[in-house]
């Protein structure tokens, strides 16, 4: 072999008799020794609907790999459900879990000297955590997500989790209606059905190049999702041999996830109005890959990439299943490439360049590829279902309408400015992020008095208690990576603002972050954060906050001298922080660096 198998340290030589005995006890056949050992990194848990259907698939992937002569071994990572952890101190653990996942994958794979990986991820911190590990390890890797949930339905309208949250806090909605919405919003397994963080990351993985076509959009319940796992099993064996036998390093994560690939992924995110959390995660993944990709790159892209796709929560018309029907991520990338907005010579895990992939999977050409038609015809089963790949409904026709359909061409873009913007100013000298795709253009310029809260809990009480009125800017401080610690998502405050019918009349700014389900004038990731001495921690009630999205600025109306002389506002909250999170806070950076741990 041109590259020595990592596993040879435990399978070769007389002195490794004990290790070989243990491999045999694990089910390895003698003829498998000396061949690649492939780790199956699963994230099954019954705490998270995005992962509850992954129990058996790891063993099915193992069986497919072993048919091809290699030994495969499965292990699990933790997985936190942000929706269940939200609204209480459980959310403090969500972002730190990303690093725990990355560490645990590195520990397991390096300790046992696995040669390659299939990563079975799905929800918010699991996909980025595994991607961070893949960049550290840099061994042949294929990602397959568990897939998106079908959209719910009630009163002939599509629903999702965010609808349940908003309606439950709206006094004009009856208890009976809330109960029915609650029962129908999440009809089974998969990650929540809009362009929230989980789906955003699984879609971006297709642009990064480590996810197969359909990774981000084929429904969890569809048979074609199961086929994707089979394809991944065959591909990882092929790529393992390409690297170790042939010395072909083009299959390695760092060869695929180059600077150009990160630029492509961010371009996609802006074009589809993805979650602002993707900014945090892409910065962290690039950090692990030792790729020079920073907030300034995101700012540059946001100024000229148009919005070509709007999905819930940015509209109620479309959910992820509709993106799939319109040709999925490769067809959004195809439209972007027509405008010269992508680097199409980048490599992909399937061996294609991006240019070759967007051509092969283009559903708008006269002769549609058979595989493309199979993938993008995958339709919802429209009934409650928690079993992976258990239905095979198909759309009668694909959505190829690029003027008025789910995916638009450049000439019919939703807006010439994309779905994300980076703002800077005296509140956020190192930047902050807003999902413009979810902001009504009438409030892209907004000015109002600050209503300051030093915790998410206090903000929720203030909003529900009527302390926030039309024209206010809600300011939530000390919720950044260090200050939280853990950088909580602010979905409940933004949902409560909507439930009070103030969605177009108020803004919210924070050094915390937002759920992918957030829309409205919600500005997060303010850096430096309050706990790192950032000026957001100096704002007091009544200060005038000026937000100007077109000019990419955010400022408090104070002179530099006034701001420099003003002390940090006192923190009045009573929050008990466990040692595990204190350790995290002692190492973590602000959001403009991806919230990564800074370790000398």
UniProtKB/Swiss-Prot annotation:
Keywords: 2Fe-2S, Amino-acid biosynthesis, Branched-chain amino acid biosynthesis, Iron, Iron-sulfur, Lyase, Magnesium, Metal-binding. One of its GO terms (biological process) is L-valine biosynthetic process. Binds 1 [2Fe-2S] cluster per subunit. This cluster acts as a Lewis acid cofactor. Coiled coil: none annotated. Gene3D superfamilies: IlvD/EDD C-terminal domain-like. Pfam families: ILV_EDD_C, ILVD_EDD_N. The active site is at residue 515. [2Fe-2S] cluster binds at residues 123, 192. The modification N6-carboxylysine is found at residue 125. Functions in the biosynthesis of branched-chain amino acids. Catalyzes the dehydration of (2R,3R)-2,3-dihydroxy-3-methylpentanoate (2,3-dihydroxy-3-methylvalerate) into 2-oxo-3-methylpentanoate (2-oxo-3-methylvalerate) and of (2R)-2,3-dihydroxy-3-methylbutanoate (2,3-dihydroxyisovalerate) into 2-oxo-3-methylbutanoate (2-oxoisovalerate), the penultimate precursor to L-isoleucine and L-valine, respectively. HAMAP family: IlvD. This is Dihydroxy-acid dehydratase. It comes from Phocaeicola vulgatus (strain ATCC 8482 / DSM 1447 / JCM 5826 / CCUG 4940 / NBRC 14291 / NCTC 11154). The gene is ilvD.
